[in-house]
Swiss-Prot record:
Keyword Phosphoprotein set for record: no
Protein name: Putative inactive (E)-beta-ocimene synthase, chloroplastic
Tissues in which the UniProt entry reports expression: Expressed exclusively in flowers.
Native organism taxonomy: Eukaryota, Viridiplantae, Streptophyta, Embryophyta, Tracheophyta
Transit peptide: 1-25
Family: Belongs to the terpene synthase family. Tpsb subfamily.
Locations listed in the record: Plastid, Chloroplast
Cellular-component GO terms for this entry: chloroplast
Keyword Plastid on entry: yes
Signals that turn on the gene: By coronalon.
Length: 66
């Protein structure tokens, strides 16, 4: 299967290989419910806590940076 490079900019999609621009309508959709409030809980995707403390990483010096 061939890989296609696509560039996304606003409501336009252009295929880099063919230079063909397609226009898609931008439709805003909203839905309100007055009877029940829906609460979505974000999942962490089983991420583990970081191995390094953030303050420790900030305290490290990099001699190659300057």
């Amino acid at each position: 299967m061939a890989a296609h490079n696509l560039c996304f900019n606003s409501a336009f999609v252009c295929n880099v290989h063919h230079q063909k621009t397609q226009h898609f309508p931008c439709n805003a959709v909203s839905k309100t419910t007055s009877t029940h409030a829906v609460t979505f809980h974000r999942r962490s995707a089983n991420y583990r806590p970081p191995l390094w403390d953030h303050q420790y990483l900030l305290s490290l010096e990099n001699i190659y940076m300057w």
